[in-house]
Amino acid sequence: MGIAEVALHSMPGAFAAHSPASNLPLAADAARGRRRRSANSLHSSRALQGPVRFPGLRAAVECQCQRIDDLARVTEGNGAWVKDAVDKASHALGDVRVPGQAVGGNGSVNGSAAKPPPQRRKASSVEDEAWELLRESVVYYCGSPVGTIAANDPNDANPMNYDQVFIRDFIPSGIAFLLKGEYEIVRNFILHTLQLQSWEKTMDCHSPGQGLMPASFKVRTIPLDGDEDATEEVLDPDFGEAAIGRVAPVDSGLWWIILLRAYGKCSGDLTVQERIDVQTGIKMILKLCLADGFDMFPTLLVTDGSCMIDRRMGIHGHPLEIQALFYSALLCAREMLTPEDGSADLIRALNNRLIALSFHIREYYWVDMQKLNEIYRYKTEEYSYDAVNKFNIYPDQVSPWLVEWIPPKGGYFIGNLQPAHMDFRFFSLGNLWSIVSSLATTHQSHAILDLIESKWSDLVAEMPLKICYPALENQEWKIITGSDPKNTPWSYHNGGSWPTLLWQLTVASIKMNRPEIAAKAVEVAERRIAIDKWPEYYDTKRARFIGKQSRLYQTWSIAGYLVAKQLLDKPDAARILSNDEDSEILNALSTNRKRGKKVLKKTFIV
């Protein structure tokens, strides 16, 4: 069955889950829900902040989600709307029912969708406390767990958007639950976010590609029109329309594919990834990423703020983090796609991109002492097909800090590569996920870990792990960040230390059979992370202070620690996240290197 024949839920508004009082069609109700939000009732709900309860409401009006059986419209990767002949697509989300709570409202915890944070009791250990906090952060939709909010500080009167379920933030939470044997929340998250993928998303009359996954979503509880005693819960996604800078989240779809594969490998339940709607969702993401454009490089071209670093930090272009996630998602998707006639061209394009991307990153992004010396001696302005300095990099770009910082043993992938520009900053997530996904060779993977060990006082210090190194300072900070007061030197994304990166470090270390690196980092974190109330990030060069604007009880700081502990206890479980080096790619790369450049006849340019 081709992509155009598959039923995908799509509607112009928030998905409404109705009380028994409502018998209207689902799509009509959802559209009405969207109009109501923009017209009146939800304007006031947006202003609500902090936990709000409606005693007895949930007992009187039990939310009963309708199964998504009536969904008839589907969107293809090219944005065309197609009618499906299937009367009942049984790929529904409403088949899971677990009593619970829900968090709702943009910037607020809304209505019966939430209960006040319980009094925190002192746990018997750091790990016990982390599990307690993680479970408190769970969000429920119609009685079923669907994700975790970004931060759950009971003393925070202004949570902004930290009470939303962010796709990237939920990944370590989802992995923690998978490793614990609690699969339902991950399954629900995967399927509910899939339904959000095809919803209408516009900003200033422009719509992005149909495969885009949201950055986050909220569960709202709102009253039903015409019935004062009935309520409905709606999922309200944000595709970047409300984000700072209004940037679409490129990494959301890539993380979704990675989590989907991890769910299947950990739970053994392959029926989810084999569902027609899930297969279609994978294809839509791939079509969006593999679409032809003007770029000559196999890397994904993105704007600033499209990934974990979601503010202006000079990573526009081809940032390493996106390329590593892209490569990993391509491998995961190829593993999960079911063979069918309509997928042949997509699989072919996927394989070609894997080979080109692997070669490009390994060859041009890699720096160690030897490569740095080559760049230092580059000739410039080379006009030829066999130029050594293909991107016309000027040797003066090699910063003095790097000459002193690069160790004799070790290396890393630079942060970005564009014509006449190499971003030599070390970005932790991109390098670690290059190891996990086998985008880095075995030699390069060990060299990255060697560098982390060698530069432990810079990258780990008193709290793992620097998101990037070094920080932008002085005039460079003013020009590149726009004088961003949140990204001051050695703070937030500009050289801040993020505890959530513990789990990526652990997966990478275990994959290379060097778990002692992760164990040492976990030991450093345990000294103070619970005492400091699980901050989002740390400031200063050695991570001595809690970040100036750091949220406390940050969920992915909690989950990142838990995943690291779980994987160190059961190292074999790291296989649900890692990719083995692909023999076909290795053969293709070795063939390309042996073949070299063909000697061309003399040509004349007219």
Swiss-Prot record:
Residues 1-58 form a transit peptide. Residues 97-126 are annotated as: Disordered. It is found in: Plastid, Chloroplast. Keywords: Carbohydrate metabolism, Chloroplast, Glycosidase, Hydrolase, Plastid, Transit peptide. One of its GO terms (molecular function) is sucrose alpha-glucosidase activity. It comes from the Eukaryota. GO terms for biological process: sucrose catabolic process. Signal peptide: none annotated. GO terms for cellular component: chloroplast. Gene3D superfamilies: 1.50.10.10. It is an enzyme of class 3 (hydrolase). Its EC number is 3.2.1.26. Its main location: plastid. It catalyses: Hydrolysis of terminal non-reducing beta-D-fructofuranoside residues in beta-D-fructofuranosides. Mitochondrial invertase that cleaves sucrose into glucose and fructose. Belongs to the glycosyl hydrolase 100 family. This is Neutral/alkaline invertase 3, chloroplastic. It comes from Oryza sativa subsp. japonica (Rice). The lineage of its organism: Eukaryota, Viridiplantae, Streptophyta, Embryophyta, Tracheophyta. The gene is NIN3.
